[in-house]
Regions:
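Catalytic nucleophile-loop/oxyanion-hole region of alpha/beta-hydrolase
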Residues: 2-38, 188-190
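Cap/lid segment of the alpha/beta-hydrolase catalytic domain
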Residues: 4-18, 95-100, 174-183
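Short beta-to-alpha linker loops that shape the active-site pocket of alpha/beta-hydrolase fold enzymes
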Residues: 5-9, 90, 166-168
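Primarily recognizes the serine-hydrolase "nucleophile elbow" in alpha/beta-hydrolase
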Residues: 22-98, 110, 114-115
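Short beta-strand/loop motif that positions the catalytic acidic residue
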Residues: 126, 131-134, 138
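Acidic beta-to-alpha connecting loop that harbors the catalytic carboxylate
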Residues: 136-139, 167-169
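Conserved alpha/beta-hydrolase "acid-adjacent" motif
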Residues: 139-148
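C-terminal catalytic histidine-bearing segment of alpha/beta-hydrolase fold enzymes
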Residues: 147-206
Length: 206
């Protein structure tokens, strides 16, 4: 497992996308030494990190990515993720947007780029199979974000597993004592199974 500490505000789009792309190239270039299966590179992101992961999965093949990384057309295909795990992701810049995420992501290019980062409209046949979970009562990033993305995945015939848990606040992580700290509201036993479900998904496909 590798963790990317990507640039946030004041850095703006597409800085983090390019950092993620460079990270994938580094991982694949060192796959043998690091004992990594090159065909099992899975992106996982939560909340705004979910937007980054899903965004990259949608645009990895676009010229602005390969140009930004200064790589050849052939090397472009080394960027393709094999799978995607999204936890309560920010997806849409439309009616159900988490607006502050897009203000920070786009900075002074907000009006110019807002529509292009509404990911339910960016899904294409090159997006990998995807696992998504969200809670019905998420008050920060509405569940519609995951529903919109899953609907777009289905429309593009992308294999998808979607779990909507009945209750729980935003940012639950593992939804247990390990990640809740002093926040009792982040201990939600009904949501804990997401990790085992994601593990089963990984074992089955990868």
């Amino acid at each position: 497992m590798a963790v990317l500490r990507y640039s946030c505000s004041p850095a703006i789009y597409p800085t983090a996308l390019l950092e993620l792309g460079r990270s994938i190239l580094i991982i694949r270039e060192n796959a043998g030494e690091w004992h990594i299966k090159e065909d099992s590179v899975i992106l996982q992101g939560c909340s705004a990190g979910g937007h980054l992961a899903a965004n990259f999965a949608c645009v990895w093949k676009d010229d602005f990515i390969s140009d930004g990384l200064n790589i050849s057309y052939t090397d472009k295909f080394k960027l393709r993720p094999n799978g995607l795990i999204l936890c309560y992701p920010v997806i849409t810049s439309g009616e159900h947007a988490h607006r502050d995420s897009f203000v920070k992501l786009l900075g002074d290019r907000y009006d110019e780029l807002l529509e292009s980062v509404s990911l339910e409209n960016q899904v294409n046949e090159d997006v990998p199979r995807t696992f998504i979970w969200h809670t019905f009562t998420d008050g920060s990033v509405p569940v519609e974000n995951s529903l919109l993305f899953a609907t777009a995945l289905k429309a593009n015939n992308i294999n998808t597993e979607l779990h909507i848990f009945p209750e729980g606040c935003h940012g639950l992580a593992l939804a247990n004592e390990l990640t809740a700290g002093n926040e009792v509201k982040e201990i939600v036993p009904a949501c804990e199974p997401w990790l085992s479900l994601a593990s089963q998904w990984l074992k089955f496909y990868f």
